[in-house]
Amino acid sequence: MSHDVITRFAPSPTGHLHLGGARTALFNWLYAKHNNGKFLLRIEDTDKKRSSQELIDSIINAMSWLKIHYDGKAVLQSENISRHVEIANQLMLNNKAYYCYCSEEEINKEKEESAKKGLYYKHNCIWKNKSAPNSNITRVVRLKSPTDGVTSFDDEVYGNITVNNSQLDDMILLRSDNTPTYLLSVVVDDHDMNISHIIRGTDHLTNTARQLLIYNALEWDPPKFAHIPLIHDENGNKLSKRHQAIGIHEYKNSGILPEAIFNYLLRMGWSHENDEVITIDQAIRWFSIEGIGQSPSRLDSKKLEFLNNHYINITDNETILNMIIPIIEEKTGHIITDVKKGYLLKGLSELKKRTKNLVNLAKESLFYVEDIPISIDQESITVIKDYKHIFSILYDNLSKISEKDWNHNILMSIIKDISCNLEVKISIVYHCLRASITGRMNAPSIIEIMINLQHKECLQRIKYALDVI
């Protein structure tokens, strides 16, 4: 494999890392890893009013959580401004750029007139081939774009892309305060970082055509481009601003495992045969740009739930326990004892089968770690009140079992005997046990729970239900 593949992820720290950005980072990382190349991180922080160190840290932490690790040191675009200005001045010296003295008011008026006529607006600067005015008025630096012909490139996903140069204006390179624009900065940084491949969303297609004009003016070889379809909502519509703003940290806080998000993002626009569950090692081995489709991918909450459940279930119980204990302790306000952790550890295998996420799992696990009195829902309270006579018999019979005989066969035998002797359905006896021991009706196998909680804890909970409720 080539060692010359260098990709990059270049987020703007004006918000948290969201799904679209994370997928872009993932695809660039995978392509570099697959080709034994390098994956670089550039923080495009030139918008100082909206950028912050907190958001930079948030983006890097989210990438690290997803196990998307960049090579070397993160580059801050703001530290390269002098280089960007240098290149703009070089274009001026080579007559590839010019000073534009048109005022903002003049340009806005032109835009309004074009809009009224329903025409595409393209600024035609009167200063393109004129000498500078005598007065010291505000100016910007614009690229001298070709007025005819086409700009075309071979996109790695969509094939040949052609844009008429008549649609491309003389873009601003330096603003009136001498700060570089995004389009110039990106080209210079990608060139200086030796970026070989740029994988990004189709919303950048127009930017690519414009950036190629800068590459041509500088006589630099451009990188290869691969534009990936955008992510749509579950109905196939463009994502709303609310959806776009959901950060990776919010998925983390809702109890989604990083492996699930990784797998979910991977399958958004890329496929390998009919595989749905794909490990990181498999993704690195299989990833190719040829596997990226041309149609927009859709959010699919059910698929994310499926993947998260899968990864929760294949993760060992000790690891999952350590993940949910902080959630439980925050919810209850209590430190969970080692004894209670032991109860929960025994019951995790069953609880994991039913869960969607870690937050849900923590909630479903509460009955294992609660002290008496445990929380009991209204349905369970009704059961306890309606079948007091059964609780009395349950307590008497279960009290006669020794700790060492507290096992599945003996417990089942007692439950069947009570059902038979009282002439009630066995499900009623199960309901009574669930109500008093777990405080809810939708718990896993009550026999398994009783074995996990052990003799003393179960009897204390049944006794509380019998005497207090």
From Swiss-Prot:
Reactions it catalyzes: tRNA(Glu) + L-glutamate + ATP = L-glutamyl-tRNA(Glu) + AMP + diphosphate
Cellular component aspect of the GO annotation: cytosol
Cell compartment(s), UniProt: Cytoplasm
Superkingdom, taxonomy of origin: Bacteria
Keyword set includes Protein biosynthesis: yes
GO molecular function: ATP binding; glutamate-tRNA ligase activity; tRNA binding; zinc ion binding
Binding site for ATP: K241
Keywords: Aminoacyl-tRNA synthetase, ATP-binding, Cytoplasm, Ligase, Nucleotide-binding, Protein biosynthesis
Entry-linked InterPro entries: aa-tRNA-synth_I_cd-bd, aa-tRNA-synth_I_codon-bd_sub2, aa-tRNA-synth_I_CS, aa_tRNA-synth_I_cd-bd_sf, Glu-tRNA-ligase_bac/mito, Glu/Gln-tRNA-synth, Glu/Gln-tRNA-synth_Ib_cat-dom, GluQ/Sye
Record's keyword annotation contains Thylakoid: no
Enzyme class: ligase
Subunit structure: Monomer.
Family, per entry: Belongs to the class-I aminoacyl-tRNA synthetase family. Glutamate--tRNA ligase type 1 subfamily.
The name this protein goes by in its record: Glutamate--tRNA ligase 1
Organism: Ehrlichia canis (strain Jake)
